[in-house]
Regions:
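Structured beta-strand-rich core segments of catalytic domains in phosphoester-bond hydrolases
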Residues: 59-137
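Beta-strand initiation motifs
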Residues: 18-22, 78-80, 102-103, 229-230
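N-terminal, active-site-proximal structural segment of metallo-dependent hydrolase catalytic domains
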Residues: 12-76, 88-92, 146-150, 244-274
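Metal-dependent phosphoester-hydrolase catalytic domains
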Residues: 112, 158-167, 175-276
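Bacterial N-terminal signal peptides
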Residues: 2-11
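Extracytoplasmic, non-cytosolic globular domains
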Residues: 22, 29, 36-54, 59, ...
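A broad, low-specificity signal marking well-ordered, structured residues that form hydrophobic/aromatic
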Residues: 22, 94, 118, 130, ...
Length: 276
């Protein structure tokens, strides 16, 4: 697996080739009692990590009106960012992007009633588009998650998304381990093997992303067309070669990710770490 917080995209020109670093992020980092970003812990993490393309879950804020969602995107990322959020659903998925969203939509996940798969075609620098897909798989069982992955794979193939374009599937997979059947199902579309993102410590939990830091719930998976451009995540003086599992309780120095507070990743009902 290549779980990129950053990729380098070559953009050909008449005289010189240019590169653009693009930071990708999967984030189900709501907190509080309403599965929303209202309390602010997740918002500070977004501000501190400064991602370019975000596959977000539980995309709730305020009254969930268009105005409130736009205000959240402005606050967490900036007024120039574009977004697509699925219509309806109690805990909707979405894609947020620094770069123009050319087309976006949702695919019905018949396994669950409160969210769908969300996709966006994004005009990143260079001659290829990037397709970002935001997913939130079930906690109920590995077999149910594999059913969802199979459905998603069929949607992607039917679209179709060109193999020559960039593809990233990111979000909350709720996987108990790195070898679940849903991961194998998606392996024909994206790179699923290690090395994996880490929180930068030597702790045995450093690769895990759930609140208890004992399971790899969250993923950023890219296709082989994109994985060749993978590059380390650079934040301040630190480089995370294989991507970052961000936990404010262990990250140091926090001054590099201001305005994040040390307790943000441990906030009440924050069940996941951000992955970049």
């Amino acid at each position: 697996m290549v779980a990129l917080a950053a990729m380098v995209v070559a953009s050909a020109g008449f005289a010189n080739a240019q590169t653009t670093r693009i930071r990708l992020m999967a984030a189900n980092i709501t907190s509080g009692n309403n599965q929303s970003y209202d309390p602010g812990h997740g918002t500070r993490i977004f501000q501190g990590l400064d991602p370019d393309i975000i596959m977000i879950q539980e995309f709730n804020y305020g009254s969930d009106s268009t105005t409130d969602i736009r205000n959240f995107v402005n606050l967490a990322f900036g007024s120039s960012f574009q977004y697509f959020r699925e219509a309806g659903g109690g805990i909707p998925n979405g894609v947020i992007s620094r770069y123009p969203i050319l087309e976006a939509g949702e695919w019905e996940d018949t396994n669950v009633s409160d969210r769908e798969f969300v996709w966006a075609k994004i005009d990143v620098p260079g001659d290829k588009n990037l397709w970002a897909i935001s997913v939130h798989l079930l906690t109920s069982s590995s077999s149910n998650r594999n059913n969802q992955a199979t459905l998603l794979k069929n949607f992607i193939n039917a679209k179709p998304i060109p193999a020559t374009d960039y593809l990233v599937i990111g979000g909350d997979f709720n996987t108990d381990n790195r070898t679940e059947s849903c991961i194998n199902t998606l392996s024909s579309l994206v790179v699923t093997s290690g090395p994996y993102p880490s929180d930068g410590t030597s702790n045995s939990s450093r690769f895990n992303t759930n609140a208890g830091r004992n399971k790899p719930y969250d993923w950023v998976l890219v296709n082989s067309t994109l994985s060749q451009y993978g590059t380390g995540v650079v934040i301040g003086s630190r480089t995370f070669t294989n991507g970052l599992v961000f936990d404010s309780r262990v990250y140091s120095p926090l001054s590099e990710v201001s305005p994040v507070l040390s307790g943000d990743s441990g906030a009440t009902n924050m069940q996941h770490m951000a992955v970049v």
